[in-house]
Amino acid sequence: MFRAHWLYLSFGLAFVISCSPGDETPAPSATPEDVHAESWRESRMLAGQKIYEDVCASCHASGEEGAPILGDRAAWSGRSDLWTAVLAEHATAGYFDMPEKGGHGELTDDEVTAAMEYILLKTFPEKPRD
């Protein structure tokens, strides 16, 4: 009888423990701002990719005129730590043999900057983005 009592008590305790909620916390859900920010980044990278392919790749895919090649870390690594600002200025205003806006004056400064951000993302994917 004493053994049966402990057996029932053990099963009951195991049942109660298995049914308790424990320390589970729900996974944090994305806020609307997070979703919007991620969607904006993706849209910007797609726009930058298109501009790169339409304009920049004519030199930066082959290294024409000494242009650093997309993805060639060594070619891009000697650049300033102020990547975004310096490269945006070079891409917008022209730099050495690279013409202003890659020779496409119809591009906005923001479009040129999006292409430059795409180049940096593809060359240095581990670097944090603004």
Question: Across the structure, where does each feature detected by a protein language model lie?
Answer:
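Sec-dependent bacterial lipoprotein signal peptides
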Residues: 1-17
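Bacterial signal peptide processing site
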Residues: 19-23
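Electrostatic cytochrome c docking/interface patches
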Residues: 25-50, 65-72
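Extracytoplasmic/secreted proteins, especially bacterial periplasmic and envelope-associated proteins
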Residues: 47, 51, 75, 86, ...
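The canonical Cys-X-X-Cys-His
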Residues: 52-62, 115, 119
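Gly/Gly-Pro-rich "capping" loops immediately C-terminal to redox-active cysteine motifs
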Residues: 58-89
